[in-house]
């Protein structure tokens, strides 16, 4: 495989500013990979798949043992499992649906995809004093079901279902997004498009319309909004997002109703216009109590393409009508809908440069953002297997690029998590060696010229350069309608 040459492994590490620990990531065709801050691989659970993988106290790992044949399905994991440090299965759930695909033995499957949460921790990453249970407790799982619902489409649909199971594997609660179609706020144009083409995938079991594609699901946990009396934010309520629909919402667990939502149309209110259109987002969750920014909504706004609406020159069938060629991290106050923090590649860049620089942080698919105890944010730019940690002031203090390997060429990282060292008592704390940032202006690989300018010839009639260089678009043509001088974060659209 040919690719541009760039360093892999850990490329930046400032131990004084980073929140150090182990980073867990799922690597396709390899398994669950645990690294230290210098990129040393300290553990690989071979072939233990992660959609995503999560680390539990005591060196336990969660993920799945297999995946359904994709000729008959779309992104169905066979189960959700918990293994110990030595790879022994200590818990597994698969008895949701008996699958009988042609040419395969009948098999019970969970049809899990994209997310799950173990009781004790609302989000699955490290939160002080909120540890996932390892020998008991319920597990909330995001699953698929194949359905027909003619209120949505006359096509076969791949529906998203939240399933809560106890330690013994009994299903104790379920919620289906298709049963709340009228609550989702689709325009009539979007409904017409959905009926004709609900984002169809073709399998040997027929067409599957992945109409919502929910890719994140977590409980809210204890939070200040509920403490102040806002029932929408009950700790048991579930926050989720749907990438195909550009929707982020909270489901009331007791009633099943959707009680909070932004999207799909970000022109609907003044507050949403200031946020700007969110497209194809991932990992929308509430920052848990005990972490900086607690109570705010954190998400990876991918950009790329998503959404349903009127057909146009870019989308002749009305699917994937919203397009943007860069990504953003957004932290949003869920009550005021104000963006209180954001990250793009062009932060602190002015003039024409944001349009150019922004594309250097861009993952059209997958990806995530985790708030760390010191206020930093761990970002997974999944399509390019880049994981990096930024401070509140947008300084990159740790960066890692997963190396390409023969086992997993062109890999991506769905979602990475940072955990404290004491989650793995089987290992001694590793040495933390600073990795200085390369000076990219002067760095050269062996054999390359030093890059110094030389051999000048003066052109007597040349008049030199003006102070400003013209580009194809001028900065006064940039749409900055999302900018508000009273906002803490301005120009969030870019």
Q: For the regions a protein language model found, what residue spans apply to each?
A:
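Histidine-/acidic-rich catalytic cores in large beta-rich domains
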Residues: 1-494
